[in-house]
């Protein structure tokens, strides 16, 4: 078989896998957004009910281990925020790498458009928040106003179903991925303290190990996870936030699919051996046909075979032949695993558990805020900076930087993506929720009042951004429907004129 015939099929296979991965991501994230909204609502209800003390006591309860005079303990909330959410940031890192290697972020002009949009969506909210809080005790909370919750955002646009063009969904995903990269960078730089250089050096050694594993194109994910766990431990003790360890691990996971010619030939040989061993697959067909008998008939046949074994010759099993077939299947499975893309395989495994368990659990553990009457929400600079940053700063920044990037020829706007779409994505990216709450816990640390005020602001801002974003998306799709109707009418008129000219 010639190389020319192999190449298109390989490109088609990779393209199909990437398309399936993107669709699977959108599916998980959209349903995860609905589940996330339920968890936020449940947390708010419980935190303001008679079960509030039980709720807060449960998530602040500590557990750990001890050895001799040494002991280690952590609260359940810290375990969720630092350990379980590391898997979420690992998934974010994998998505970023996939998009930059094969997806909508591949190529400088393409990646620069999404990164410019994300950069604008970071700079403008930070400027607005800093305007209200510069020089105050709350100025460290600027990172709260710049984060996007991808799950909520995708869950929102899925409410409109097929009305939402696919390019809008893809742009939202790539913008959110680039936005997460910016948020992670801000966390690593501005929300890390008491840096311990010895642990930094240990972390750098482990980063070198991960780079070497990637260079050797090691396919065993267990080796990466072992190095990643050690890296997480070192980064945690270094004073830098552990999210950076998860992203570094993601960047080290190989993103190549290498189909070795030797493995491919060996797989074909195993298939030929199975074909011969099963009498040109006839034994397999007969075995499947024999299994199609009913439950009662099959049970009676098995009992009769057990009691009168010599009378049912057909049920005798050739153990040597069966073992040979099992060995062949194991060999084919091994070669198949060698050919799989580790990045996509790990991403597919992490998507459902993050969307359905880790992120909703984080939301339920952190969204519980007690609404007390003595909180002055009308004049608080934290609330004004957060709400205006997310609701106004996000769409203005995204739209402005996309426009400047295209006009200055720094980036290429994707085909079929208009500026009304970009505005709607900017509105939707103002939904902060989990990412903003995550940053709020880091920014205000032990200031419970500021954390609660920030969380209330996030909930209000995200709700406003969701309503406005949904409205703008709907308006943009109405315009698209009208354009399609006009095109169809023009086609009908043209066909009518052609018919009349023929007559």
UniProtKB/Swiss-Prot annotation:
Catalyzed chemical reaction(s): Na(+)(in) + 2 H(+)(out) = Na(+)(out) + 2 H(+)(in)
Alphabetized InterPro entries for the sequence: Na/H_antiporter_dom_sf, NhaA
Molecular function, one GO term: sodium:proton antiporter activity
One GO process term, biological-process aspect: regulation of pH
One GO CC term, this protein: plasma membrane
Bilayer topology annotation: Multi-pass membrane protein
Keyword Transmembrane helix: yes
Compartments, record wording: Cell inner membrane
Segments crossing the lipid bilayer: 31-51, 74-94, 112-132, 141-161, 170-190, 195-215, 229-249, 348-368, 384-404, 420-440, 458-478
Keywords: Antiport, Cell inner membrane, Cell membrane, Ion transport, Membrane, Sodium, Sodium transport, Transmembrane, Transmembrane helix, Transport
Physiological role: Na(+)/H(+) antiporter that extrudes sodium in exchange for external protons.
NCBIfam families for this protein: NhaA (TIGR00773)
Record-linked HAMAP family: NhaA
Family classification: Belongs to the NhaA Na(+)/H(+) (TC 2.A.33) antiporter family.
Descriptive protein name: Na(+)/H(+) antiporter NhaA 1
Lineage of the organism: Bacteria, Pseudomonadati, Campylobacterota, Epsilonproteobacteria, Campylobacterales
Gene name, Swiss-Prot/TrEMBL: nhaA1
